A protein has these predicted regions:
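Short, flexible active-site loop motifs that bind/organize anionic cofactors or intermediates
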Residues: 37, 71, 85, 110, ...
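Asp-based, Mg2+/Mn2+-dependent phosphohydrolase catalytic module
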Residues: 1-10, 100, 116-117, 121-216
Length: 216
């Protein structure tokens, strides 16, 4: 059972917890390969296979999240591609209301994200999620992704965190596992299905809205 006192730090991922991950999926699976194919006059399916192969190679590293890496690799401007789209990012169902409820608490609140800072700042122009948090801590600035213990050392120092009195929320199981290994006492995995507690102590909730309803 999630326990929250007045000083418990609330640490949350962004994409897949607060914002709908479909937006990012469309970038990687549609917008980016279509742009590269049009620009290079290459077969779209071949480009998709090439990009997916590199994604699989870089997954869990900073390169995977760093749009500068993909700019250089594919000779594109990822942010220009994103800005050209009519579609904008959106909140997951119930997450905006959940943030409004959490905002009534005086607890310290921070976003911890692997996402590229430029992309996340652009998303904040559309959905002002930053108003609900004290800060946003980027793995790009830390120099390590959330999958690595070094990220957590820097996050603890920079945000003055007590891992014994913190809740971390994420939708990526590898990140969730990394958080438990560095000693965060309460780790929440946002994943479909019934609420349950895993063997490593991680507690699951289907959504941020479900978690918020359980603690407020």
């Amino acid at each position: 059972m999630v326990k929250l006192n007045s000083t418990t730090a609330i640490l949350s991922d962004l994409d897949g917890v607060i914002l709908n991950l479909d937006y990012d999926i469309k970038f990687w699976e549609s917008w980016l390969p279509e742009h590269v194919a049009n620009q290079s006059n290459q077969n779209l399916e071949e480009i998709k296979i090439k990009i997916q192969a590199e994604i699989d190679t870089q997954r869990g590293t900073l390169n995977f999240y760093d749009l500068n890496y993909w700019d250089d690799l594919l000779n594109v401007d990822c942010m220009e591609i994103i800005r050209e789209q009519e579609e904008k990012c959106s909140y997951l169902e119930g997450s905006h209301e959940a943030l409004q409820r959490l905002s009534t608490l005086k607890n310290p609140k921070h976003i911890l994200t692997n996402g590229d800072p430029r992309a996340q700042e652009y998303k904040a122009e559309t959905q002002n999620f930053l108003e609900f948090f004290d800060s946003i801590f980027y793995s790009m600035h830390a120099g390590y992704p959330k999958e690595q213990k070094e990220f957590w050392t820097l996050a603890r120092h920079n945000l003055n965190l007590d891992f014994e009195n913190a809740i971390f929320i994420d939708d990526d199981f590898k990140v969730v596992t990394a958080a438990t290994k560095v000693g965060i006492k309460q780790v929440i995995w946002i994943t479909p299905g019934k609420n349950r507690v895993l063997q490593n102590g991680v507690e699951t909730f289907p959504s941020l809205a479900d978690l918020t309803a359980a603690i407020i």
